[in-house]
Amino acid sequence: MWNPNRELSEDCLYLNVWTPYPRPTSPTPVLVWIYGGGFYSGASSLDVYDGRFLVQAERTVLVSMNYRVGAFGFLALPGSREAPGNVGLLDQRLALQWVQENVAAFGGDPTSVTLFGESAGAASVGMHLLSPPSRGLFHRAVLQSGAPNGPWATVGMGEARRRATQLAHLVGCPPGGTGGNDTELVACLRTRPAQVLVNNEWHVLPQESVFRFSFVPVVDGDFLSDTPEALINAGDFHGLQVLVGVVKDEGSYFLVYGAPGFSKDNESLISRAEFLAGVRVGVPQVSDLAAEAVVLHYTDWLHPEDPARLRGALSDVVGDHNVVCPVAQLAGRLAAQGARVYAYVFEHRASTLSWPLWMGVPHGYEIEFIFGTPLDPSRNYTTEEKIFAQRLMRYWANFARTGDPNEPRDPKGPQWPPYTAGAQQYVSLDLRPLEVRRGLRAQACAFWNRFLPKLLSATDTLDEAERQWKAEFHRWSSYMVHWKNQFDHYSKQDRCSDL
């Protein structure tokens, strides 16, 4: 489903517009799609993003855009004009400006634009919510399996520069910044074939990891004036309408791309040692103590060696850390600060899915139902799945029309309640009627969003003290070596003769 159907090209800044036929007699709501792909891959041309079924069924206008990804869209040398970073996000903003100026010509209503996206696309939607110049270009937002506060979604300016200079080194370009020239660095990168840059991107990551990407948005003080967490905490979201959600097994897809013992070609029944190693890959850049806390929380201590339980636990670690708990945190903060929020968990595994059963409902596999792919007669979906896809398209279109996914013509049917910070109500989306639940993986998310930050904060001073002690020790050690060398040199000299 994710395989590219076009050649790699730097000539990529296009958008697509679908309009219902016959054309509506009055302006119709507009849905604008941003694809995911970890900010390193993706294209609006993928078959799964075909908008014809959604548009014809719900008579909305649908727009999808391309934006630059990887180093082409997110390489950053903060402080330089040549590569300021976040140009992929600026591509998206430009598309939103185009929609405001032109969508009326396609029957769309520029005063009723809903921005929706999945994974990195959802994180992008969130960043536009947090960036004032973007905020006025759309009116509602849908974030599917991603959030701007995810640990993978942004980097700081220092790390962004390190990655840029590392890529330059890998392709034989001079370093920028201190001791170098950013203009020369960027000019050199422009002489390298696009495929050479793509082939070297993954080598700039600081350590082995899953669900981490080389070139992502940077907290630059411009597009993002502060970290997403700080902007979410400080924001005023009164009047905003947001739909957020996750799939049942967010982590499983990523494990087959680098976690020890995992493969899409077998049952991935891992050992305890592989689980422990997998935690370090799944939660990179944390201290040993924090990793131990993750292991403690996710181990089933009645069956600590059971391979299937360990496999499921590591899937939960990766999914909770990167998707579920950032989304839950975002939903709670937005709701507490005045937004009207609706939340879901997508729990249906498609009958056509080729991934092994142990992967459950993987990351990204709600999209085909949102876009109505089961209505394509050439596909082999079941009748129940076609009905399910029609339901989901109606929910998304209702939200685009009114800010409420519920069916206004059926007030006695199952109702989707708003998500609040207190009640934390969400719905399960599968072939059955809506089921309302409470607490989106509340225990796990209390660990990630409450306990672990406090643990890291409490141990930061210890870590800093240890770093200072080590620095002083190494300085003292080097002095001792120098003194010993000087003493040895002196002791070998001829002694002064008696005067």
Label every model-predicted segment.
Residues 38, 274-278, 456-459:
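Short, cationic low-complexity segments
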Residues 2-182, 191, 222-257, 339:
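Serine-hydrolase-like catalytic core of hydrolytic proteins
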Residues 173-186, 200-202, 306-307, 343, ...:
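Surface-exposed patches in mature extracellular/periplasmic domains of secreted proteins
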Residues 84, 88-91, 322, 359, ...:
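Secondary-structure capping and boundary motifs in well-ordered enzyme cores
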Residues 292, 296, 315-316, 324-499:
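Mobile gating loops/cap/lid regions near enzyme active sites that modulate substrate access
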Residues 148-149, 153, 188-386, 395, ...:
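Substrate-gating cap/lid region and adjacent catalytic-acid/histidine neighborhood
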